[in-house]
Amino acid sequence: MGTRSIDIKTRRKMAAILRVLQSAGKPLGSQRIGETLRAGGIDLGERTIRNYLSHGDELGWTENLGRRGRRLTKLGIQELEGELVVDKVGFVAARVDMLAYQMDFDADARRGTVILNISTLSLRDARPAITRLMEAFDAGLGMGRLVALGAPGEHIGAVRVPKGCCAIGTVCSVTINGIFLQARIATTSRFGGLVEVEQGRPLRFTQIITYDGSSLDPLEIFIRGHMTSVARAAKTGNGVLGASFREAPAIALPEIQRRIELSERAGLGGVLALGSPGQPLLDIPVPQGRVGLVVCGGLNPVAAIVESDIAVTSTAMSALCNYDTLIEYGELRKTARRKGLL
């Protein structure tokens, strides 16, 4: 049976199974897949899952590794990327909430997991890419000052670095949601967009994409469309960079300010602006009883690389990673030399 003959309900169930395999980053059996699906509100029996997996094998989407279970193939990844777009609308908003919940970073103790964006590029571009990246961090245009660096075959979180490539992990802005959630502060992520900065100060949003209405991360879209000017902002203080807008309960403002300070001390700072209760922030209206925050896009330093015509493949909100494995961006060159990347 070919892909065209699969009805919508079957395709959706198959996509759910493929997503479980993709998120796991390792082979899984039908029992583990079923447990994960049920946790997400999808109830499928093991026999049914095995039937779907057998069909996935026939289509080349999954590979049977015997007792180890199945793993997702490149063809399976392509199928997920092209799945029914109507089913993916709102996916970004759901992933933001999921990762914030899964993250367990303790800002007081400075331990636990944080959320990373993963960007891969050719080894031959490592030297100029690191230079562009560090310039953006020097100007304070990243989410904090910590990064991860992976050589071919290494892992950043559950993501394996491809052969002939290096990978850079930048802290995702959703990390701030997780830090607030640990303090019982519920955060609403309204949209991602582009912010115009002048002399290093944010002025206004020039473009916005709501998370609820998008199947892709907004900053990924803007970077691919070459709509940022992060490198120019790093050099002159004037430019356009990625940012996101969040709301939180105004009653929690003192604790929000405390958490922001703790985040900055831990190298995870990135709040560009914090508003007043019920007051607009960068011309964006905020309801009574709420306070607005503008958070720097974690992929901004990567945008500076892309602006230099270096080919980069980025995935926002890609992985959970232990805080202890991150390094200061100033150590990138030394770490790259030690790993044989320069």
Where are these regions (language model features)?
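Conserved segment of winged-helix/HTH DNA-binding domains
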Residues: I77-Y101
